[in-house]
UniProtKB/Swiss-Prot annotation:
This is Opacity protein opA50. Implicated in a number of adherence functions. OPA proteins are implicated in pathogenesis and are subject to phase variation. The gene is opaC. Expression of opacity proteins is regulated by the number of translated repeat elements CTCTT, which code for part of the signal sequence; the protein can only be synthesized when the number of repeats place the start codon in frame with the rest of the protein. Belongs to the opacity porin family. GO terms for molecular function: porin activity. InterPro entries: OMP/PagP_b-brl, Porin_opacity. The keyword Nucleus does not apply. It comes from Neisseria gonorrhoeae. The lineage of its organism: Bacteria, Pseudomonadati, Pseudomonadota, Betaproteobacteria, Neisseriales. It is found in: Cell outer membrane. Keywords: Cell outer membrane, Membrane, Signal, Transmembrane, Transmembrane beta strand. Its main location: membrane. Pfam families: Opacity (PF02462). Residues 1 form the signal peptide. GO terms for cellular component: cell outer membrane.
Length: 236
């Protein structure tokens, strides 16, 4: 331990692995919402992904309690999904002409936790001169962007062997339930922190930590992250 009891300002740099759970309350195909019916699939309503990102912090160590401000920026998630189904509508017995309906669904979605600016209060447990487990609480101002573009196209197809009649499209039905949405939202959320610090030198500490954060109610979106991180903390 140092002569000043470990007190003083510090900086910390971490590399974090984040598990991200994103839930969107988009209108459902079977549940009209405000007169609109959505074609958004469950895949884009309930997203589970992960990312690796850096995090930087500045704080002050009071010799037991610490306060810290941190900043992180996450990786953007995006994906698309295409599906097609063909339904037989009618077969003419006398000439075997067949009418089918072809339904195509195209979805493009993205989600980006643009930034998180947090303030934490942390308590270090003094186990010995080297190891210091800790727990803490965090409040953060987060900024997220998300978008969805979901469309459905229904096409009538005619298959025929009748001379003089060509197979092909016989009608295109009105596209039902297209859903397009793009939001940029800022909210305050709450989280918890836990981990352990190992003093390499009196001023340099290796830090292994975990944090859970609920980003709050983001309009029609809920966002939660679990993060495991490894970093170093230098006290001046």
């Amino acid at each position: 331990a140092s002569e000043d009891g470990g007190r003083g300002p510090y900086v910390q740099a971490d590399l974090a692995y984040a598990y991200e759970h994103i839930t969107h309350d988009y209108p459902k195909p079977t549940d009209p919402s405000k007169g609109k019916i959505s074609t958004v699939s469950d895949y884009f309503r309930n997203i589970r992904t992960h990312s690796i990102h850096p995090r930087v912090s500045v704080g002050y160590d009071f010799g037991g309690w610490r306060i810290a401000a941190d900043y992180a920026r996450y990786r953007k998630w995006s994906d698309n999904k295409y599906s097609v189904s063909i339904k037989n509508m009618r077969v003419h017995k006398h000439n075997s002409n067949r009418k089918n309906l072809k339904t195509e669904n195209q979805e493009n979605g993205s989600f980006h936790a643009v930034s998180s600016l947090g303030l934490s209060a942390i308590y270090d447990f003094q186990i010995n001169d080297k190891f210091k487990p800790y727990i803490g609480a965090r409040v953060a101002y987060g900024h997220v962007r998300h978008s969805i573009d979901s469309t459905k196209k229904i096409t009538g197809l005619l298959t025929t062997s009748t001379p003089g009649i060509m197979s092909g499209v016989y009608k295109v039905l009105r596209t039902p339930g297209a859903h397009r949405e793009s939001d940029s939202i800022r909210r305050v959320g709450l989280g918890v922190i836990a981990g352990v610090g190992f003093d390499i030198t009196p001023k340099l500490t290796l830090d292994a930590g975990y944090r859970y954060h609920n980003w709050g109610r983001l309009e029609n979106t809920r966002f939660k992250t679990h993060e495991a991180s490894l970093g170093v903390r230098y006290r001046f």
